[in-house]
Amino acid sequence: MGAGAPTATGALALNDGWAELKRMWVVPQARGRGLSKALLVALETRARDAGITWLRLETGIANHEALGLYERSGFVRIGPFGDYRPDPLSVFMEKRLS
């Protein structure tokens, strides 16, 4: 990682009453320091501030680290949402924001 290089990223796609967590990523060299959790908390706060009730996401079945983070953070598995279709390689999750 060079000086000034991005370490982590994430985004929200806002919808009517819900948002989709998009492109959350921490560079491998910075993992294990709590950045993923901090980024997720920041995105949840931003969603709440925008009046969002539900936060949803799609991730791959092989992304075990992300699945663990989301489950520990209160996300539960659901079926496809939005424009997604059933996909055996995808996991769909949501969390109610209070």
Predicted regions and their residues:
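Acetyl-CoA-dependent GNAT
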Residues: 1-22, 27-29, 40-42, 46, ...
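Active-site acidic-Proline motif in GNAT/NAT acetyltransferases
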Residues: 27-29, 33, 61
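Short, intrinsically disordered/low-complexity patches at protein termini
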Residues: 31, 44, 88-91
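Short coil/turn segments at alpha/beta junctions that flank glycine-rich nucleotide-binding fingerprints
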Residues: 33, 49-53
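C-terminal "cap" of GNAT-fold acetyltransferases
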Residues: 53-56, 60-73, 79-98
